[in-house]
Amino acid sequence: YGKTLDNPVTFAQLLREIDKIEGLERIRFMTPHPKDIEEETLEVIRDSKKICNHIHFPLQSGSSRLLKLMNRKYTKEHYLEQVEMIRRILPDVSITTDIIVGFPGETEEDFEDTIDVVKKAKFDSAYTFIYSKRTGTPAARMENQVPEDVVKDRFNRLLATVNEVSHEHIRRYEGMDMKVLVEGKDDHEEGFVTGRMTNNILVHFAGDESLIGQIVTVHLDECKGFYYMGRLIED
């Protein structure tokens, strides 16, 4: 960012300036590319009371071989080094990711590399996808398309691992009082609203529409996997 401006600035400098704007209570910077994230940016997030404590850090695959075929410009080892840097500077950060299963040529060893990264990175959640051909892309023309039954089996194994790891990591907030930005009515429970903590974790609790847009304190009663059930604490 900012390299073509008359007075070049870094993305971290931009974030720092946005952080100074009065009236803003939450700033959400979500998705850096693994090859581009820098310590300066993480330090700005650490020092800010407004920038959300959440990094969406797309993995796609834990196999360095497949990452090269995907033209991702990083390796498994580099990705894990970046995760370590993020957690060193932001110890309580929530890290989420994207993962694709069944990319052409994916072997069992490649898939196990992905599972290994999930366990080591301790993601709070992961958006998991089954690879599908996109007309006109190099991957669609590749040989060694992975059989559908193999892809489905790997996808289910990945989901099981993600659920186990994320639940163990997310439940660290159980029993705590946390600030929640109320975003809307709960679609599944009458008389409930839903919101997000600064780390992007969803919280559902009893409340009415007048709370939407407010930041309130919620006691986190129970972790339900990727979200919490809680109760409003009156300030």
What are these regions (language model features)?
Residues G2-G23, M70-K73, K133-E164:
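Radical SAM enzyme [4Fe-4S]-AdoMet core and its adjacent flexible, acidic
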Residues P32, L69, A126, F205-A206:
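Thr-Gly-centered strand-to-loop micro-motif
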Residues R141-D235:
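Terminal RNA-binding accessory module
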Residues E81, M85, D113-K120, V150-E164:
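A non-catalytic, amphipathic alpha-helix used as a structural packing/dimerization or gating element
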Residues Y1-E108, K119:
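Conserved SAM/AdoMet-binding glycine-rich loop
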Residues I45-D47, T114, E143-V146:
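Short, hinge-like loop/turn segments at secondary-structure boundaries
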